[in-house]
Amino acid sequence: MSDKKALIVIDMQNDYLWDKRKKIFSYNTPELVSAVNSLIHKFRDEGNDVIYVGQIFPNIITNKWFIGFSIKGTSGAEIYPDIDIVSDYYFEKNFPDSYTSKRFRDFMAEKKYSEITICGLDLCGCAGATAKGATRTGATVVLSEAATGCRFGNKKAAKMKNKLVSLGVKIK
């Protein structure tokens, strides 16, 4: 394993952050984007990799009807324009854990990062699931609490943080 570190920026997409998002996505967009961008620049300035992951559902009628967000080929699935893009490392996933994407998993295995920091959306969703997945890599796993949104209540958030800590994730 190398001494290289990586930041994984998860699901910072229009459908979750823009003004026309569904009401269930109640994030404080300016605050979250600012925190994520600060982390992006910190990692880049230190010479570490920044990796972007987007939740993408296949563009089929049932997904449009029943899910209604992050549909492949729609503007809602695109990375939110205020997120700073500092690398070409972008991966799509269909499930909450980014490690379920073979392309992503193979990339991460090839890079052999010693430490992985996760931020983005959502603590009780894809960011939390990816943190769990990352614990199986042998790398140190950190979840940036300040740069990770959570649309769920404090009780559910605390339960997820406790679960992640029990798996060895550091919450900072």
Predicted regions and their residues:
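A short, flexible beta-alpha/helix-coil linker loop
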Residues: 15, 22-23, 148
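Active-site-adjacent betaalpha module
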Residues: 1-6, 34-46, 67-172
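Short, basic/glycine-rich phosphate-binding loops at helix/coil junctions
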Residues: 16-19, 56-63, 79-90
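Catalytic metal-binding/acid-base residues of hydrolase active sites
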Residues: 13-15, 56-58, 96, 122
